[in-house]
Amino acid sequence: MEWLVKKSCCNKQDNRHVLMLCDAGGAIKMIAEVKSDFAVKVGDLLSPLQNALYCINREKLHTVKVLSASSYSPDEWERQCKVAGKTQ
C-alpha cells in the first residue's frame, strides 16, 4: 500500500523522521518513525519495496526504513514529535 506524507517532524542529527501518513483517499491512518539519508517532505509518496523499506516518490534509490508504526491519534503525534526534540 502506498502512503502520502501529510506532516513530517525530523531529527536531522540522526536522520530520523516521524511521519503522519494518509491513504489514497486522504484519510490520516498512521504515524511512522523512519530512518533515511534523504529528506522526506509533505506531499511525498511512499511506495513499498521489501523488508520495511519504502521508496520516496517511486525513486527506488531514495528509500526510507520503517522503524516503528502506530495508528494515528493527535496525542500520539504530538508526543512522538516532542520525543528527542524533533521539530516540524
Curated annotation (Swiss-Prot):
A Pfam family hit: PmrD
InterPro entries per UniProt: PmrD_dom (IPR044854), PmrD_sf (IPR038679)
Origin: domain of life: Bacteria
What switches on expression, per the entry, is described as: By PhoP.
Q: What is the effect of changing residue 27 to T?
A: In strain: ECOR 46, ECOR 48, ECOR 49 and O2:HN / ECOR 50 / P97 / UPEC
Mutation effect (residue 19 to I): In strain: ECOR 23, ECOR 32, ECOR 38, ECOR 39, ECOR 40, ECOR 41, ECOR 51, ECOR 52, ECOR 54, ECOR 55, ECOR 56, ECOR 57, ECOR 61, ECOR 62, ECOR 63, ECOR 64, ECOR 65 and ECOR 66
Q: Does the keyword Transcription apply?
A: no
- What's the effect of swapping residue 84 to E? In strain: ECOR 28 and ECOR 30
Q: Which UniProt keywords apply?
A: Antibiotic resistance
One biological process term from GO is: response to antibiotic
Summarize the impact of residue 11 to D.
In strain: ECOR 46, ECOR 48, ECOR 49 and O2:HN / ECOR 50 / P97 / UPEC
Upon changing residue 81 to S, the result is: In strain: ECOR 53, ECOR 59 and ECOR 60
Specify the effect of residue 14 to N: In strain: ECOR 53, ECOR 59 and ECOR 60
Question: Function of this protein?
Answer: Interacts with phosphorylated BasR protein to mediate transcriptional induction of BasR-activated genes to induce polymyxin resistance in some natural isolates.
Q: Which family does it belong to?
A: Belongs to the PmrD family.
The protein in question is named Signal transduction protein PmrD
Q: Source species, please?
A: Escherichia coli (strain K12)
